Amino acid sequence: GETNVDINLNPKGTGTLKSGTAAVKIAGKETIWVPAVAMYPTTTNGCADLAQTELTAGQPELKSLDFDASSDEFAQFAVAFPKSWNEGTVTFQAFFTANTTNTGTTSWKVAGVAIADDGAIDTGFGSAVGPTAKAMSGTANDLAVTAESGAITIAGSPAAGEEVFFNIFRDVSADDLSADAKLLGIKLFFTTDAANDA
């Protein structure tokens, strides 16, 4: 008989594909949380080093990278995506705060480059992309979450098994918050096209 045959199942409406009573995971959009503690300031024009801030004893403390209002500052991080990643574009949302009652906006942008085994790490990033600048609420230390960015094309011809380096920065030419923006982390969205990483 035939081998390697696909099975196509199409849930109706808002129905969920299940095996017995358990939902079956379907390839598609996925999320990675990258906290500020997994990032590092760049040597040139870097943001401030990782800081910990207590707001009230016994309540959530902040681990943040602080970005000035006066000039563009940068940080980096890296991700080895799962094999099921489709090697396509990615998007992100930034999570941040500021110790100010200012209602100004903050603009975050991200660029990436994929490096293969035996490839040169000393390689330029692709074009930086970011969401619309996000305004603060006017209450000090409120959480601010940006909209999802546009598609970020990763330089370096991404392929399975590569490491992707990312460069994130505050674009002060596109914002007007007159205080440090405290980056807490980002949600990084990517797309899978396989059921697992086998």
How would you describe each model-predicted region?
Residues S157-V172:
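Noncatalytic modules at the cell exterior or secretory-pathway interfaces
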Residues N102-V110, D180-L183:
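Short coil-to-beta strand junction motifs in C2/discoidin
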Residues G1-E2, D6-K12, T16-T21, K25-G28, ...:
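Beta-strand-rich, repetitive solenoid scaffolds
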Residues A120-S157:
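Extracellular carbohydrate recognition and processing domains
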Residues A22-S70:
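N-terminal leader/pro-regions and domain N-caps
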Residues F169-A198:
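Proprotein-processing/basic-patch segments
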Residues D68-S84, T89:
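Short beta-strands within extracellular/lumenal beta-sheet-rich domains
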Residues G88-A98, T106, I186:
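A short beta-strand element within beta-rich, extracytoplasmic domains
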